């Protein structure tokens, strides 16, 4: 991505002199390793690396390989990564405020210089930190009180360093200083690079072609696993982390293409395997062969999931011993005597053949091995009977309500008719009485 006029150029090193230098690692991970800018419209390769869509497509027009691991790559292999794109955009909106929040004020830097003992300060390192911090303060001028205070503290420190007592004191070694290998251009611990890696890299040829050996990785870890305790103590007093820990995730990502991956553990066709053959497969993987045949099938199926998820998808896979411990924990709660794997009789299906007591079914119902399909088959007749009874009850209720309404209507009509008949009878009686009276008067 080209830099536009007036665009502010950012870099992960902006966080180096802050209270949280590990943020430089996060900043690096959200950048495209082609344009070195923040990811824009990121896409994922089949080898697990992420680049800007435009950057990687332009690169693939010239070279059909991944820029990081040199694996074969074509444009039709790219996959969209919407989540990573939104994370990068969100981070860019917060980056300026985040950097301002974690930046160390010059006054605190001066206090660190005054309070630290000569044993805890390196001769050149502290002066460089002070100068970089004074230059990093926006809007600072040479004659400002803050800058003068920092310069005065640095001057006092240089005066201490000129004394004989300071010259006799043992200076600590630099922590986590990493330099690039002139052959493979990868960063290594300086001591490890000089003593081990250069000879090995010359013998193996270029690192990209041959891959890094297990011995190199183990020996490098031995050099970096125990940093100088005195420097670690100084870093803790300043509120910082040891330098070795700052770029761990970035290095893991960049070196992901060079890690040795194990082959996929295949699924087995258990119906064609005898029990002895199944035990042999488990023994080859270092897994126990105890239990029923179904338990052994469940054991292999779950270990196959653990294996492929760990060695094929993880950027930092654990060892096989850790996988076996996870399998043991799973077996303690899941792989009991009743089978649970798909394609075979489940726990409830097995109970249909052996024990259908209510207590046994209820016990199985309360566990996470509950099989809904088998439960439906077991109680299907009862469910259908209840449904029919409910429908019949509803029909009878509706019919009863209709009959009641009809009866009410008929009774209402009958009462009206009776009232009408009674009224007519009364009217006729009245007319007859009046007629009789009129006749008597006429006589």
From Swiss-Prot:
Catalytic activity: S-ubiquitinyl-[E2 ubiquitin-conjugating enzyme]-L-cysteine + [acceptor protein]-L-lysine = [E2 ubiquitin-conjugating enzyme]-L-cysteine + N(6)-ubiquitinyl-[acceptor protein]-L-lysine
Keyword Cell inner membrane recorded: no
Record SMART domains: RING, SAP, ZnF_Rad18
Annotated positions binding Zn(2+): 181, 184, 197, 201
GO terms, molecular function: single-stranded DNA binding; single-stranded DNA helicase activity; ubiquitin protein ligase activity; zinc ion binding
GO cellular component: chromatin; nucleus; Rad6-Rad18 complex
UBZ4-type ZnF: 178-206
UniProtKB keywords: DNA damage, DNA repair, DNA-binding, Metal-binding, Nucleus, Transferase, Ubl conjugation pathway, Zinc, Zinc-finger
Residues of the SAP domain: 270-304
EC number(s) recorded for this UniProt protein: 2.3.2.27
Cystine bridges: none
Role played: E3 RING-finger protein, member of the UBC2/RAD6 epistasis group. Associates to the E2 ubiquitin conjugating enzyme UBC2/RAD6 to form the UBC2-RAD18 ubiquitin ligase complex involved in postreplicative repair (PRR) of damaged DNA.
Subunit record text: Interacts with E2 UBC2, forming a complex with ubiquitin ligase activity.
Protein name according to UniProt: Postreplication repair E3 ubiquitin-protein ligase RAD18
């Amino acid at each position: 991505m080209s830099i536009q006029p007036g665009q502010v150029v950012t870099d992960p090193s902006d966080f180096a002199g802050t209270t949280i230098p590990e943020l430089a690692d996060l900043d690096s991970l959200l950048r495209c390793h082609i344009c070195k800018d923040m990811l824009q419209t990121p896409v994922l390769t089949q080898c697990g690396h992420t680049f800007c869509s435009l950057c990687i497509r332009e690169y693939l027009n010239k070279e059909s390989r991944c820029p990081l691991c040199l694996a074969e790559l074509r444009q039709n292999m790219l996959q969209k990564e919407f989540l990573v794109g939104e994370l990068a955009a969100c981070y860019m909106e917060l980056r300026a405020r985040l950097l301002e929040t974690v930046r160390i004020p010059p006054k605190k830097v001066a206090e660190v210089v005054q309070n630290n003992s000569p044993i805890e300060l390196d001769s050149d390192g502290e002066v460089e930190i002070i100068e970089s911090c004074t230059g990093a303060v926006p809007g600072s001028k040479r004659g400002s009180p803050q800058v003068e205070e920092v310069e005065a503290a640095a001057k006092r420190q240089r005066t201490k360093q000129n004394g004989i007592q300071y010259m006799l004191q043992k200076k600590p070694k630099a922590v986590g200083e990493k330099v690039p290998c002139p052959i493979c251009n990868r960063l290594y611990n300086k001591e490890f690079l000089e003593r081990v890696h250069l000879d090995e890299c010359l013998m193996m040829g270029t690192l990209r072609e041959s891959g890094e050996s297990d011995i190199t990785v183990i020996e490098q870890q031995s050099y970096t696993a125990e940093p100088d305790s005195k420097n670690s103590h100084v870093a803790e007093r300043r509120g910082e982390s040891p330098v070795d820990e700052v770029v761990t995730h970035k290095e893991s990502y960049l070196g992901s293409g060079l890690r040795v991956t194990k082959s996929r553990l295949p699924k087995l066709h258990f119906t064609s395997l005898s029990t002895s053959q199944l035990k042999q497969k488990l023994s080859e993987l270092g897994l126990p062969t105890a239990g029923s045949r179904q338990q052994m099938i469940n054991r292999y199926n779950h270990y196959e999931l653990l294996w492929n998820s760990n060695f094929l998808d993880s950027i930092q896979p654990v060892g096989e011993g850790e996988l076996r411990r996870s399998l043991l924990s799973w077996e303690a709660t899941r792989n009991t005597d009743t089978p649970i794997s798909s394609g075979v009789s489940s726990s409830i299906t097995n109970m249909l053949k052996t024990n259908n007591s209510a207590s046994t079914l209820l016990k199985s119902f309360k566990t996470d091995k509950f099989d809904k399909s088998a439960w439906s088959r077991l109680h299907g007749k009862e469910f259908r009977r209840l449904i029919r009874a409910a429908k019949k009850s509803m029909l009878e209720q509706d019919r009863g309500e209709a009959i009641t309404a009809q009866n009410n209507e008929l009774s209402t009509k009958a009462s009206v008719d009776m009232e009408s008949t009674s009224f007519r009878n009364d009217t006729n009686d009245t007319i007859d009485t009046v007629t009789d009276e009129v006749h008597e008067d006429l006589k």
